[in-house]
Amino acid sequence: MSRRGTTEKQIEKPDPIYRNRLVNLLVNRILRNGKKSLAYRILYGAMRNIRRATKKNPLSVLRQAVRRVTPNVTVKARRVGGSTYQVPIEIESSQGKALAIRWLLVASKKRPGRNMAFKLSYELIDAARDNGNAVRKREETHRMAEANRAFAHFR
């Protein structure tokens, strides 16, 4: 067993324009091949589209979208006596937020549209209104956890 202590969780830095940690989390998930300026351009373009389409503060739309997509429980495969069970597990808010961001990005990549900023903005707007593929994914996960509640004692 390791004698090394556990490291403290690093606090995410806020982004330069909105000064928000959630925006920076989203940028870091969009990031590919170290092109952070491109990731910022995509997200800020999406924020402009949100402001144009909804006439609301894009940061509040983003927060509401992430809140609506964040799951409370998830299922984890657990092997017991030769068979695999999907065991429902409650997850903490940081893990739920990470899942929500991942689902939002996957759903927006699957959308038809001109570019990623456009697709992301409309996925965020839909999620804030409680519909869209990311919200469907959360509901599906909750249904799966509810269906497998009988296996919760395997935790």
Swiss-Prot record:
Record InterPro entries = Ribosomal_uS7, Ribosomal_uS7_bac/org-type, Ribosomal_uS7_CS, Ribosomal_uS7_dom, Ribosomal_uS7_dom_sf
List, alphabetically, the Pfam families matched. Ribosomal_S7 (PF00177)
A GO cellular component annotation in the UniProt record:
small ribosomal subunit
Please indicate if the UniProt record lists Cytoplasm as a keyword: no
Q: Name one GO biological process term.
A: translation
* Molecular function GO labels: rRNA binding; structural constituent of ribosome
- Keyword Iron part of the UniProt annotation: no
What keywords are annotated for this sequence in UniProt?
A: Chloroplast, Plastid, Ribonucleoprotein, Ribosomal protein, RNA-binding, rRNA-binding
- Location in or out of the cell: Plastid, Chloroplast
Lineage: superkingdom: Eukaryota
Assembly and binders: Part of the 30S ribosomal subunit.
> What HAMAP family has UniProt attached to this entry?
Ribosomal_uS7_B
What does the UniProt record say this protein does?
A: One of the primary rRNA binding proteins, it binds directly to 16S rRNA where it nucleates assembly of the head domain of the 30S subunit.
The text of the family note is: Belongs to the universal ribosomal protein uS7 family.
Q: Which PANTHER family match?
A: RIBOSOMAL PROTEIN S7 (PTHR11205)
Q: What is this protein called?
A: Small ribosomal subunit protein uS7cz/uS7cy
Taxonomic source organism: Anthoceros angustus
